[in-house]
Each structure stands twice: as structure tokens, then as C-alpha cells.
Amino acid sequence: SDGTQETCLGKWSFNFFRFSENTTLHAPADSPYTVGTPIRLGHSPQRRKLVLSIFVDALSWAIARPYAETHLPNIMRFFSRGTIFDQQFSSSEYTLPAYPAIETGYYPHHTNIFNLRVGYELPLRMPTIAERMKGLGYHCAAPMATTQGIAHGLLRGFDRVIAAGWTLHTSVGVDSVLRHIDAFDETDQFLFLYLLDVHPYNARWFKCDTAVEAHLPLAERFFPHDSDVASVRLPNLRIYQEQYLEQMRQTDRMLGLLFSYLEQHFNEDEYLINLYSDHGIPMFGDTVGGSIDILSERSTSATWMMRGAGIPEGAVVHDLTSTVDIYPTLGHLCGFPVNDDIDGRLPALFGGTPRDAVYSASQYPGQTYKLAVRTHDHTMRVETQEPVDEDGTVDFMITRAGIYPRGHELETGCAVHREDLNAFFYPRARDFVREIANNGEFWPEMRAARPEWFGGQP
């Protein structure tokens, strides 16, 4: 109605314009520009005003549980009015395979994302949570996300993604979420917040928090440095433990601001808040024969808490649950369809069938394959002699296996030999690895390319 008008667009970033009438966009012929998908305003009674997923990378519930009152007071206060899953376990020991499993409900040997050297995108038949939520009419955004998932297709379905590689601090993420909630308050929003503060890293490359440095005795500041040690194999050093606990405390402090805002601006039935982690960490005493146990209970214990519409209040669930169960649970609560062949299960709390066991596996090419099958009372541990091949398959001909009481996994003299336990665990373990067992058959060229893995054998 006002004719042609000119405006200046911010450089290297998207701008938002509110349209209430038919509008035509023009640009000089030599100035290329991109137009995003329109954001439709309006709420629906079939949706919640806010569904927020908070991904706290590497937050081990087995480690956090004893410190919950002192280091996670805001998280515990908020989710005490919701549900806490006390026996939640990860599908894998680190993020690359564990993250896609959460986003799809499929184990890593089904997503085929487990190899750092191979860029593999999720097949379209495995829609992500954001794709499902987009199909329901939500405005989907990731106010803070990791770039790691982009190439694998994990961020499909989002209308907006603000991603970074390393600096994913809770203080920045919370601010970004609050800004996004305010900006798009006329839409029903599905938001994804990825937090990296808690995740430990090799001290050779990362500085510890000032609070840790200021309080740690000088003697604890001197320790062997090995720049090649990955986070999943960090040693049991006090400096790493104190850094982990301090970052837990700071993450909780910042999330407390977010939770207070939500309680002040939303009714309980207007939101669904989902806080979870992808795996734990082993550096609080998990060693076997001097080596780090990357599938220990602390390493694979994950965090999962929910609050809001459809979530029982004040519930602590002791049923066994897996990170792949998050997908079907959101499907049940939000109303999106779930593939029949996913590995995730709907928890009994929401009308599903309880698990009789949970599975955590390490399928890392060049290293031995490791599996933990856990019940409430026992754990079966499996490890191959052969390393995992580049394609994720492994030879199970020579395998070490044992069944142990929970809390005593791989400890000398603690293996349990009972026919009833053998009859329970062995068929389940065989069924889990059936699709990746190569029965000693392999491509010679593939093995020849990795002589350091296979001793130079063809």
C-alpha cells in the first residue's frame, strides 16, 4: 500500500520481517539473496506453546545423583514437579553415535553413524524429532546447537539453527532460548538447546574453570599429560573430577534462570520440558586392570527428566530406560507417528512395556567391540578379540563374556555362573550383535588399508 520501499539487510545474517499483507521482495540484479521458509503465526489447541529439549552432553546420572542437592538444586527443584528416570542408560559411550540414536530412536548399528572417518547421513526413512514436530505445525528452532550433527542430517526439520563447534556454554544458550521464546511467542515452538559445559576434555588443550584452579591444592595441579587421550578415557584425577562437578553446578545455576522464566510466563499445561544427556563419563574410579572402562555404569549412565503437560508429577521411575526411548516418548506425548521398527520403547509410565534389559555398546572402528547388557541386578559384559572393521562389522569368533552383579562389573572373582542368568543374557546379547557379526568374512582390501588395526594381515 506504500509502494516500493528500500531497507538495509544485516550482513551475513538472516533478517525477520512481519508480513500482514501481500508483499513482493526485490533485489538488485547483481545481489543474490536467500528467503527462508515463512513462519506462520498462531497457536493450536492440539499443540503446546513450548516444547523444549535440553541436551546436557555427558551428564552422568550415576555421578550426578549423589550431588543432586548440592550441585543441581535448580534442576531438582524444577523436575521434582515432573518425572525423573532413575535407571536411564546410553546406547553408546560418546556423542557421535549416541546423538543420532536419541534423534531417531534407532541404535547406532542401525543409523550407521559410528565412524569418525566416514560422513554418513541419516536415511530419509529415519525422520528426526524436529522433522516430526515440524509436521505437527511447530516452529522448530535450535537456539544453540552443535555443528557436529549437520553433516549427518541430525538438524533436519529445524527452521532456524544457531550452531557452534566448541563454545556451547549454558549462559549463552539460556539467553538465546529466552530471546527466541520472546521473539516468536505467537507460534507454538519446539526448541532444542545443546549444552557442552559439563563435558570433560583433556587438560592439555582446555583450561580448567577459575573456581577449580583457585581451590585445588597445588599438588593436584601436577599430573602426567598425554595429549592423545580422548575424553572417554581420561584418568581418575581430582582436577578432572572437580572440573566436572563445578561445570555441573554452573550449568544448573544458568538453567535455574530459564526454569524461573518458564514458571512465570507459562501455565503447566502449556509446555513440555525434556532434559537429557547422551552418555556419562568414567573418570570417577572406573578402571579394570589399570585401563579405563568405557562401558562402566558411570560411563553409560545418562540423565532423563521431564515436566509439563502429560507428565506425572513427583514421579521417580526405576524401570530400565534407554536413550533411544526418548523418541517414542515424545511421539506419544506430542502426537507424532513413530516407525514400527525403531529400537526405542515407550516407558511403562506412559502405557508402554517395561524393558527387561538395556543395551550399551562401543562400536569404534579399530578398537575391540564391547557390549553391556544390564538388568536391575546383573550385567553381561562382552568384548571381542578382533577390532571393529571400518564398516562397523566385527568377528565374534573369539569373545570374552561374563555376567556380574551390578556395581561389580568386570571385577576379579565377581563373575556369576548360573544357568538361569545364562539363559536370559546370552540369547539377548546374540540377537543384539547379529547384524554386525561378519563371521570372519571381510574385504581384504579394507583390512590391508588398516594394517595397524589387524597386524598387517590381509
Question: Locations of the language-model features?
Answer:
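Catalytic domains that recognize anionic headgroups
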Residues: 1-458
